[in-house]
Amino acid sequence: MIEFTDNFLEEHIAQLIDMQLREVSWKYDYDSVKGGTNKHWHLFLGHNIGELGDFVAIWNQISNNYNYKMERAYLNAHTHGIEPHIHRDDGDMTFIYYPRMDWRIDWGGGTAIYDNDLNGITHHISYKGNRLIKFPANLPHQAQPVSRECYQLRTCVVFKTTRKK
């Protein structure tokens, strides 16, 4: 089931995470598809709750609301001109948190989810600060382009999960 939740975190926690992400030292040259030509900024957070640091509040809220085990978490970022490939994730469920509280709808940068045969987009979820997206990991999906009018970094926090037994 594909769903999204606005105002996922309490406002003051969302603001704190937004500020913390602006201080991250990003690493460039990550590809969402092995051997892919399109790269983006990325920072691996870890495989367990103890490695999440400042971003543990997001996971705590996810685990309070959903019955999934975190396999790994990481940060992704894009700017205008960087368009990741359509790809599928491993695991059972993917959670993407949008932290930028100042993001404008006309900047784009949402997430498109495609049908299994890649005949079309079934869901387009716009980027909105403090929004959590949840979708089955095997569905093809892609971060959407950022407008050339945007001079900000489109950031997200990603959690790859498996169903708890």
Features from the language model and the residues they span:
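Catalytic core of non-heme Fe(II) oxygenases with the double-stranded beta-helix
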Residues: 56, 60-165
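Non-heme Fe(II)/2-oxoglutarate
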Residues: 1-68, 78
